Amino acid sequence: MLVPKRVKHRREFRGKMRGEAKGGKTIAFGEYGLEAVESHWITNRQIEAARIAMTRFMKRGGKVWIRIFPQKSYTAKGVGVRMGSGKGAPAGWVAVVKRGKIMFEIGGVSEDVAREALRLASNKLPIKTKFVKKSSEVGGESNEG
């Protein structure tokens, strides 16, 4: 499971998720990727479930790159605890994913295998996603479907 080794502050503000992702919008490592169409928090358990779904389908072929990391903590109070008396204890870790961010990449497999593996991974995530290919021309838009 992905968790930070150490953090400066255990309890963070929730923050806003306005606009698009600033970086990580292009495929850098593999040939195919899974792009977020909407913004959302993705928990470390969801990332792990998506990774397992992809690697199980691909068996021993290809390579998977995870481009997001859960570095934000979220807090929760216990069930039946009354309001007030401070912020709750850290309950887990999330990755803040904005629209346009490439979350997972796959390389070394055919397009059909990559498409199905990323579809299985997207079923484990709480957001809408789309399958993207690395553009063949450098600096140009891909004109294939």
Curated annotation (Swiss-Prot):
InterPro entries per record: Ribosomal_uL16, Ribosomal_uL16_bact-type, Ribosomal_uL16_CS, Ribosomal_uL16_dom, Ribosomal_uL16_sf
Pfam families per UniProt: Ribosomal_L16 (PF00252)
GO MF assignments: rRNA binding; structural constituent of ribosome; tRNA binding
Record-linked Gene3D superfamilies: Ribosomal protein L10e/L16
Entry GO terms, CC: cytosolic large ribosomal subunit
Family recorded in the similarity comment: Belongs to the universal ribosomal protein uL16 family.
Subunit structure: Part of the 50S ribosomal subunit.
Name this polypeptide is given: Large ribosomal subunit protein uL16
